[in-house]
């Protein structure tokens, strides 16, 4: 399943709407080639439509990029709800579940890093609508980890959350620059060691 297929919503009749098809194609192209490298003409052509239709649904490329990232952020945020359902009332298990999920993601063969982090590098302009999506997501993710660390009664929850956050971001860069061999196992071991170091 491609990134595009993972982020498609269908209409009432079960068919993919033009808007969703455009968004799905954009998601796939942006992730594989980078946001700056992909123009709206390429997206429209790959989606089997034209620029006029694209701009009818997305007033600008910036708005299309923002919606692409918003969908990714929503999907990532929903994973926290699944962890809470799998480990109700057990914040430490939820934290470890998140760590294991991230390790599996980093170790997967199609991992090109975090799409939101990649976008942040490509879009440094603070007033870009996509930048606000990225910052809101990363801030919320960090706060979620802080809350879990605090609920698990671990010492210095903010510091631990930052350590885990930086470990994950570093692992993503390592996966792209050096390779993935053994990376998932090392990520889990290091994360577990960080958690253990903050136990009361």
Regions flagged by a language model, labelled:
Residues 76-77, 83, 93-97, 126-151, ...:
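Amphipathic alpha-helical packing segments from all-alpha helical-bundle domains
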Residues 2-4, 21, 25-63, 67:
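Helix-turn-helix
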Residues 105, 147, 165-183, 194-200:
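Amphipathic C-terminal alpha-helical segment
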Residues 70-76:
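Short, basic, alpha-helical segments at the C-terminal edge of helix-turn-helix-like DNA-binding modules
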Residues 1-17, 199-200:
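N-terminal intrinsically disordered/low-complexity leader segments
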Residues 67, 81-112, 151, 157, ...:
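Hydrophobic alpha-helical connector segments
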């Amino acid at each position: 399943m491609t990134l595009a297929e993972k982020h498609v919503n269908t209409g009432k009749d079960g068919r993919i709407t033009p808007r969703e098809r455009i968004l799905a194609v954009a998601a796939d192209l942006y992730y594989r080639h980078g946001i700056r490298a992909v123009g709206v003409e390429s997206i429209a052509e790959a989606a089997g439509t034209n620029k006029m239709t694209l701009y009818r649904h997305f007033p600008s490329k910036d708005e299309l990029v923002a919606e692409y990232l918003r969908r990714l952020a929503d999907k990532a945020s929903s994973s926290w709800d699944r962890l809470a359902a799998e480990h109700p009332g057990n914040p430490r298990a939820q934290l470890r579940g998140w760590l294991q999920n991230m390790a599996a993601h980093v170790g997967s063969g199609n991992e090109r890093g975090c799409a939101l982090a990649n976008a942040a590098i490509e879009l440094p302009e603070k007033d870009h609508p996509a930048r606000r999506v990225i910052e809101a997501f990363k801030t919320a993710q960090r706060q979620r980890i802080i809350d879990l660390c605090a609920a698990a009664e671990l010492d210095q929850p903010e510091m631990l959350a930052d350590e885990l956050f930086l470990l994950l971001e570093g692992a993503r860069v390592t996966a792209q620059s050096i390779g993935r061999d053994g990376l998932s196992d090392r990520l889990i071991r290091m994360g577990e060691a960080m958690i253990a170091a903050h136990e009361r």
